[in-house]
Amino acid sequence: MSLSTSVIPLILLCILGRIVYQYFSRKVCIKRRKAYIDAFLLPNRVARKLKERYPHLDERNISDVFRELKEYFHIIRESKENGNEAFLSMPSQIVDGAWHEFILCTREYAECCQRAFGRFLHHTPAESMRNPAQMQEGLERTWRVACNREGIKPNDAAALPRLFALDAVLEIPDCHHYVLNREARAGSALVPVAPRDVTLDSEKKIHHASHIGCSAGCGGCGGGCGGCGG
């Protein structure tokens, strides 16, 4: 047996070993990131600022907001893990507000991004997007992942995912209010907004045109200043 012939099985074994190692390493990484998002606690400053802005919210309401921000992070994580790098729009005004406040805690936010996504999660305001259709596409992507995570059929939804329903449930002023198409009546002031199952009050759509669709995108992590206090 020649040397080259005897080396080939060894090379193939090394390649196979590397593939197996990468597969299980990825599984461990996914499990670790998922567990981190489930367990991490937002800084106290975020809750304090939300209560100042929305004084009618109680502790349970704030917990619901935090839960849905973490759910949005899971939606991003899951989408990226499945190879989808397209941006995902934020459907909730109150959750977006919590996200904004968390970003101001620069050190904590940067650490969360690194441990949850492996890179920095940028917040892209709707105003910087090219057109409303771009925001719409991002919202549809969020809708599909949110529905799948809650066992809802995206194209035949019997209920709204919690992330889409939260603003109305918490009675947030000038909120993003979604209803299912089957609830719309002919001639009512309802127009399509996300997937074909979801509609948005046309007045609110116009009123919130500059806010709907804040989105997330991952990129390189730059330096940051100090974090916020508890």
Where are the regions that the model predicts?
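Acidic, Ser/Thr/Pro-rich intrinsically disordered cytosolic tails and loops
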Residues: 2-230
